[in-house]
Amino acid sequence: IFQRLSEQIGPHRVIWRFDPLIVGKKLSVSSILEKIGRLGTALSAYTERLIFSFLDPYKKAMNKLHAIDPSFRPPTNEEETALAEGIARLNSFWPHSLSLATCAETADFEKLGIQHAACIDPSLLLRINPEDSDLAKLYAGTRQCHFPGAFSATRLYIKDSGQRKLCNCAPSKDIGAYGTCPHMCTYCYANTSSARTLRFFTAHDSDSSLLI
């Protein structure tokens, strides 16, 4: 699906995310890097960017994770560094080198060429829609120049005040809805009940403009 979507709309529009990074007795730094390495070999030609982040130990998420494996936990500072160094090293061997970034993280890995991401990235929006005057007014002068062809990096852009402190996203409107994804990822905070989510999914009308 990732490759097909990239071929249809362009690799700059499809961002590869690998998060959150979780460690445990059966999930070591080396095993995580092995998985990322295999995926990077397969996906690097179909995207321009990899964004990753580390597990935030929200109580509800940790309860769900510990129900599967009590050893699951966030990486230590040393493990975060090892993961970042490993990802940067893998990137140098992939068929196509990617722009690397973290999402809402305090750790600074810029010496490894890893930036702080903005998932709603104004520089990418401006790159995709360079003639959109409304976007230009809102996002012109972005400092988040993660993509070629972005505007000047010397001025600040408007940050979304509704997001957490470390989030770099520009203002946007969420068009998604909670409780609508049937993948049921254990860490996901958007699903509170599998039965409720499956009920919504079953009732979804693909011809409707609404999710539910």
PLM-predicted stretches and their roles:
Residues 1-86, 90:
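Conserved AdoMet/S-adenosylmethionine-binding subsite of the radical SAM
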Residues 1-11, 192-212:
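Conserved Radical SAM active-site core
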Residues 43, 47, 189-196:
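A generic secondary-structure signal for well-formed alpha-helical elements
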Residues 53, 103, 191:
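Conserved residues at the C-terminal ends of beta-strands
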Residues 59, 108-110, 184, 195-196:
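Flexible loop/turn segments at secondary-structure boundaries
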Residues 79-165:
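A C-terminal junction/extension of Radical SAM enzymes
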Residues 137-138, 142-143, 177, 193-195, ...:
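Long, low-complexity, charged/polar intrinsically disordered accessory regions
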Residues 165-193:
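Local cysteine-cluster metal-coordination motifs and their immediate loop/turn environment
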